[in-house]
Every structure is written in structure tokens, then in C-alpha cells.
Amino acid sequence: VKDGKIHSIGKITGEAKDIIEAKGLTVLPGCIDTQTHFREPGSTDTEDLHSGSRAAIAGGITAVFEMPNTNPPTSTKKEFQKKLDLAKNRMYCNYAFYFGATADNANELADLKNLEGCCGIKLFAGSSTGNLLVAEEKDIETVFKNSSKVVAVHSEDEEILNINKKLIKDGDVHSHPIWRSVECAISSTRR
């Protein structure tokens, strides 16, 4: 490491100039955040790939897996490539992106096996930001059957979410776990 940057990777020779006494402390390597929402493209007023990755590094995160529920969603090879292009030379950490599963692209997911920069398929069984909901059982099964990568699931029962929407209190963040309840997640996962 020179001037705060990795200069080379290889076998370490010699002794360290500085030794840090870490007795009684917890020492971790850089961590991996497997669920980031940097909201690019679409909502760069809140955060983007550049600022989000910079914040990740400041917090000890050296790699991120970014979610596909952006605007437009990262659910086609064209949009996936656009996201890779947006990230190139702008991110401070290692990164990979999830490819968003939809009912429309479920039969094409086997083609992603060697898609560079893709860490997996994201399946939204409950609605979230964007329009990536895959609520029908037959479509969920098709996603799993055809996926050539790990499938990460946003597991919430859409029917319960819709019933619970009346529990949302505008501007009250404390209503979030009431609306998106434990029952909602367990019901979806049991399916």
C-alpha cells in the first residue's frame, strides 16, 4: 500500500514498519455488503454508484452487490450493460450487480450463467421499489427452474402486503415493520 492505495498484490516480504496492537479488539477484513440500493439509474438525487461506493469504503465495506430495482430496472441484458458502463471508473470498491427477475424474462435467465459482473438473480415475491414483482406461483417456479445463478429472494406475501397497506401511517417510519410484518415474510417463505 502506497499513499492509501493498493500498489501491488503478492507475497509480503520484509517486516512491517508499523505494528498495531489489536489485543482485545475485533479485526475484520473488508466486508461484503450483498444488498445495496444505490438507486442508479433513476434516483441519483439520493445516492448513486459513486457516492454509495465511497460511503461503503468509509464503513469498511470493500465489495457490494447492488440491487436491480432502479429506474429503469436492471432486468434486461441491455440495462445490465448500461449499469456496468455507469459503474466503470466511478466506484471505489469491488462490485457486482443483481439481474432482476420478471415474469417476462423468467425463461431467459439460463442465458446469464456467464454474464460478467452479475452476482445473481433477484426475485421480488413481494412488491418493492420499482416494478419487478413476480407474484404468481407459476412465474416464481419458472424463475427458479431457469436461473443459472444464485437466486436472492425478497420474500413477502403480496396479498398480505396489500391487506396491510391500510396500516401505513404517512411519514411514520415506525409503521414500516407493521405493514411489512414478520407474518408477511414467513407466509411468502413457506410457499
Where are these regions (language model features)?
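Active-site gating loops and adjacent loop-to-helix segments of metal-dependent hydrolytic enzymes
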Residues: G59-I61, D85-Y92, E158-R190
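Histidine-rich, glycine-flanked metal-binding segment
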Residues: V1-P29
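Metal-associated gating/positioning segment near the N- to mid-region
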Residues: L25-R90
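Hydrophobic faces of well-ordered beta-strands that scaffold small-molecule active sites
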Residues: G30-T36, V64-E66, Y95-F99, C119-L123, ...
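Active-site mouth loops of central-metabolism enzymes
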Residues: T34-E47, T70, C93-N105, L132, ...
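Metal-dependent enolase-superfamily TIM-barrel catalytic cores that perform enediolate-based chemistry
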Residues: I121, N131-V153, D157-E159, S181-S188
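Short, acidic/polar
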Residues: D45-S53, A103-N114, R191
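Active-site gating/metal-coordination segments in enzymes
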Residues: N89, C93-T142
